[in-house]
């Protein structure tokens, strides 16, 4: 019975395939953040990851706010 449990554990851990780049995606302290060399135009820089890359957080759907300064007549 121990051999069956051991074989199950070995096959279970071997089935966990690494991503194509050979390492797990590192995430930053924010739940939706990701570590990149440079943040995209639709992301903001919110901190640093453990590998010293910027932690980028997607902006999402932000409403566009028009300027409220009065126009000169």
From Swiss-Prot:
InterPro entries, alphabetized: Beta_defensin_dom
Leader sequence segment: 1-22
Tissue expression remark: Specifically expressed in testis. Low expression is detected also in liver.
Highest taxon, organism lineage: Eukaryota
Coiled-coil boundaries: none
Predominant localisation class: secreted
Subcellular location per the Swiss-Prot or TrEMBL entry: Secreted
GO cellular component, one term: extracellular region
GO biological process: defense response to bacterium; innate immune response
Keywords: Antibiotic, Antimicrobial, Defensin, Disulfide bond, Secreted, Signal
Cysteine-cysteine disulfides: 28-55, 35-49, 39-56
PANTHER family: BETA-DEFENSIN, BETA-DEFENSIN 109B-RELATED
Family: Belongs to the beta-defensin family.
Role: Has antibacterial activity.
Protein name per its UniProtKB record: Beta-defensin 108B
Organism whose genome encodes this protein: Homo sapiens (Human)
Lineage per the UniProt record: Eukaryota, Metazoa, Chordata, Craniata, Vertebrata
């Amino acid at each position: 019975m121990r051999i069956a449990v051991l074989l199950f554990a070995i096959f279970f851990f071997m089935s966990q395939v690494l991503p194509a780049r050979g390492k797990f995606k590192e995430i930053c302290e924010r739940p939706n953040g990701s570590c990149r060399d440079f943040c995209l135009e639709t992301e903001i820089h919110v901190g640093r990851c453990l590998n010293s890359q910027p932690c980028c957080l997607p902006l999402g759907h932000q409403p566009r706010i028009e300027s409220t300064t009065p126009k000169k007549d």
